[in-house]
Amino acid sequence: MSHLIYSRKADNTAMTPEQIIARAPAVYADTKAEKLTDRYAQLKTADFIPIMADYGYLPTQAAQRKTRKNNNPEHSSHLLAFAKANDLNGSGGVRSEVLLYNSHDGSSSVRLLAGAFRFVCTNGIVAGEGFNTRLHHTKNSINSFEDLLRSTVEKLPAVLELFEKMRAIKLDQEQKNTLARQAVSLRWNYVDSVYEADQEAGIYADNWSISDALSTKRHQDVGDDFFTVWNRIQENVLRGNVFVKKVTDNHEVRIRKSRPINSVKEHIRVNQGLFDLIEV
């Protein structure tokens, strides 16, 4: 996987099985990691796709964690996003999605997460902890999947309603700075200045990073409403449009542009953390 934002089709419509396999081969894996015991029941991600289709949801994104050289890529964590067949073009520039996260190496349970997709910036949004459910890898647990799916789908309108409330709230500069500082702190240690003599080695965000997080990439993102500001910050933090500072063991300070998040697990963690910053 090169980058999560490239794990969708260019037109953001439904994906074919061949397109899914090209981006996330673990979705169609038939085996589990050899280290796992018989108590671990493999829940094949591909088996969930027809169930999602029965509820009108089609796959629109497939992403997979990169594996180390000796690890089997068919067992690593992966993500599928699903959207309603009649809502692939969205309304108001945003469509709701159901995200399915799974692995076959024992590193995670099956997770269903409420989410959304914003077309103008191709941002995938993952709702916070109160909007997701888990399914453990045990025998017969797949029978509970539909109950979890219905529970997740019921939460989707609340996500879109929250966005509407955010659009009605205007933020002043101090509020924007506070939100951006909280956001960058989800990825990097935040300090007012890295030029302290006793600063430990590491990657740090500072006031310049806040400015980068708030920066606008397109005219559609110009605005002071909560939703627009939050989306600017989310895009910049997830995609690495933020300059940070690296402090070496010799206390040298080097400025570097951050990288996009390529880990599926980290993408979900930071994305959920950003969602949890929303207070209306």
Task: Give, region by region, the residue ranges found by the protein language model.
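Intrinsically disordered, low-complexity regulatory segments
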Residues: M1-L43, D54, N71, L274-V280
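Intrinsically disordered, low-complexity regions enriched in serine/threonine
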Residues: M1-R8, N86-R95, S103-V280
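Amphipathic, interaction-prone secondary-structure segments
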Residues: Q42-R111, H267-R269, G273-L277
